[in-house]
């Protein structure tokens, strides 16, 4: 894995090119960029064929230990790695410990292992056990075992223990990586921990310096508990820590930061020098039955009336026969309407989350194209201001719907929602 910086702007972050290859493909992506958040080896709600409508480029797929550990025996038997096993052999696989879309469960941490909660319950992973799984998965890129279960509320004592454990785990995983014949083509990225404590962040970066020849990049972790917690982060606290950390990291290595950050937070992180994010935000919005509609065209004259999202459960869309976003060219917006999406939700059709996910991913990737354009022109502050003018929409409360004004053609009982006999 190689990272090349193309330009560094004064106030808008940096542009770069990340080149990654595996046995089947050689992928080059422009940064700031996105990796595809996967669950169980697949993009949620989308088949491989539908995914090809979204992007013709070879994807970088983010696999998490929490929803793939049950595959270990089968992947080991396959002997071609997790990408081939899940039917995306040409994709670049990136293995992380925990799913950024799932809230971390509080748990007791021991010095010798990291608890992982998967579909089969809690499992305690030591460095040795973790590297056995990594050898079976043969990921293109992976992070060593680390203790990053910290957030703004974590005590200094907890943060210190997180750093101490992470240092031990990283040493053991790096040593195992050096000795492994199966992982010679796998790239290691270093986890930077320390919560919101700047001194511990600096200590974490300093510790990783000794492995600079082993690490192809860095991942800033330990700032939130995954899931929706990332959408609720306080901007000022987050930016201070990320800015401090990025200033300490080598400039020639790629920087990852995963989590369901809001578009406004994403822009702040890009400005600080983060290069790669994931699509868990688009997935969580799909789970909430919401379509992303925020504008990233700074020439949009109607920005003051724009809403950042729309909720397909809202009855006001029942007779809106236009796509989610007027100018959107995704398959969902060109072939379907808000009214149809609202109908699909009401009838609990499986197609509803599919077209939502198609649109949300497309919209999010287009957003990052706009980000790269503004970084190249050093005008990211214009995009920040543009987003701040738009209105956030609260979650729709289905209990607020007046059942006395129900659709006369709805043959379901208003109380039970079952078909009337």
UniProtKB/Swiss-Prot annotation:
Q: What SUPFAM superfamilies has UniProt attached to this entry?
A: tRNA-guanine transglycosylase (SSF51713)
GO: which molecular function terms?
A: metal ion binding; tRNA-guanosine(34) queuine transglycosylase activity
Disulfide cross-links: none
Look up the signal peptide feature and give its range. none
Keyword Plastid on this protein?
A: no
**Is Acyltransferase among this UniProt entry's keywords?**
no
**Where along the chain is Zn(2+) bound?**
328, 330, 333, 359
Q: Which GO terms describe its cellular component?
A: cytoplasm
Q: Where in the cell is it found?
A: Cytoplasm
What does the record give as cofactor? Zn(2+)
InterPro entries found in the cross-reference section: QTRTD1, Queuine_tRNA-ribosyltrfase, TGT-like_sf, tRNA_ribo_trans-like
Broad class of the protein's primary localization: cytoplasm
User: Bound how, and how many: what does the cofactor note say?
Assistant: Binds 1 zinc ion per subunit.
- Keywords, alphabetical: Cytoplasm, Metal-binding, tRNA processing, Zinc
> Which GO BP terms, alphabetically?
tRNA-guanine transglycosylation
Give the family this protein belongs to, as stated in its UniProt record.
Belongs to the queuine tRNA-ribosyltransferase family. QTRT2 subfamily.
Q: Which HAMAP family match?
A: QTRT2
The role this protein plays is: Non-catalytic subunit of the queuine tRNA-ribosyltransferase (TGT) that catalyzes the base-exchange of a guanine (G) residue with queuine (Q) at position 34 (anticodon wobble position) in tRNAs with GU(N) anticodons (tRNA-Asp, -Asn, -His and -Tyr), resulting in the hypermodified nucleoside queuosine (7-(((4,5-cis-dihydroxy-2-cyclopenten-1-yl)amino)methyl)-7-deazaguanosine).
Q: Spell out the NCBIfam families in the cross-references.
A: tgt_general
Q: Assembly and interactions?
A: Heterodimer of a catalytic subunit and an accessory subunit.
Task: Write the protein's name.
Answer: Queuine tRNA-ribosyltransferase accessory subunit 2
Q: Which organism is it from?
A: Aedes aegypti (Yellowfever mosquito)
């Amino acid at each position: 894995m190689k990272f090349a910086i193309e330009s560094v702007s004064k106030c808008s972050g940096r542009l770069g090119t990340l080149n990654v290859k595996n046995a089947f493909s050689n992928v080059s992506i422009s940064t700031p960029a996105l990796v595809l958040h996967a669950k169980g080896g697949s993009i949620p709600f989308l088949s491989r064929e539908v995914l090809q409508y979204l992007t013709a480029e070879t994807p970088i797929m983010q696999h998490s230990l929490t929803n793939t550990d049950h595959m270990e025996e089968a992947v080991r038997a396959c002997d071609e790695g997790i990408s081939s096993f899940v039917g995306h052999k040409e994709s670049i696989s990136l293995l992380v410990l925990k799913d950024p879309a799932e809230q971390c469960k509080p748990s007791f941490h021991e010095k010798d292992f990291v608890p992982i909660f998967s579909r089969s319950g809690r499992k305690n992973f030591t460095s040795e056990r973790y590297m056995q799984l990594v050898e079976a998965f043969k990921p293109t890129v992976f992070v060593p075992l680390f203790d990053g279960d910290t957030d703004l509320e974590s005590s200094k004592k907890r943060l210190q223990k997180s750093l101490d454990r992470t240092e031990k785990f990283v040493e053991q995983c790096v040593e195992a990586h050096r000795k492994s014949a199966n992982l010679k083509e796998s790239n290691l990225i270093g986890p930077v921990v320390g919560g919101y404590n700047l001194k511990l962040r600096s200590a974490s970066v300093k510790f990783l310096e000794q492995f600079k020849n082993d690490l192809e990049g860095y991942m800033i972790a330990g700032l939130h508990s995954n899931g929706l917690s990332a959408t609720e982060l306080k901007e000022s606290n987050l930016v201070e820590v990320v800015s401090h950390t990025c200033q300490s990291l080598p400039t020639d290595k790629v920087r990852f930061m995963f989590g369901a950050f809001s578009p406004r937070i994403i822009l702040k992180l890009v400005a600080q020098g983060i290069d790669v994010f994931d699509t868990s935000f688009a997935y969580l919005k799909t789970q909430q039955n919401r379509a992303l509609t925020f504008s990233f065209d700074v020439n949009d004259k109607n920005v003051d009336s724009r809403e950042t999202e729309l909720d397909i459960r809202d009855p006001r869309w029942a007779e809106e026969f236009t796509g989610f976003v007027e100018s959107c060219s995704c398959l969902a917006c060109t072939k379907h309407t808000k009214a149809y999406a609202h109908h699909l939700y009401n009838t609990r059709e499986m197609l509803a989350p599919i077209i939502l996910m198609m649109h949300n991913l497309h919209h999010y990737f287009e957003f990052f194209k706009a980000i790269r354009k503004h970084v190249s022109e050093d005008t990211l502050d214009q995009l920040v201001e543009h987003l701040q003018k738009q209105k956030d929409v609260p979650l729709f409360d289905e209990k607020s719907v007046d059942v006395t004004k129900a659709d006369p053609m709805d043959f379901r009982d208003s109380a039970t929602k079952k078909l009337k006999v």
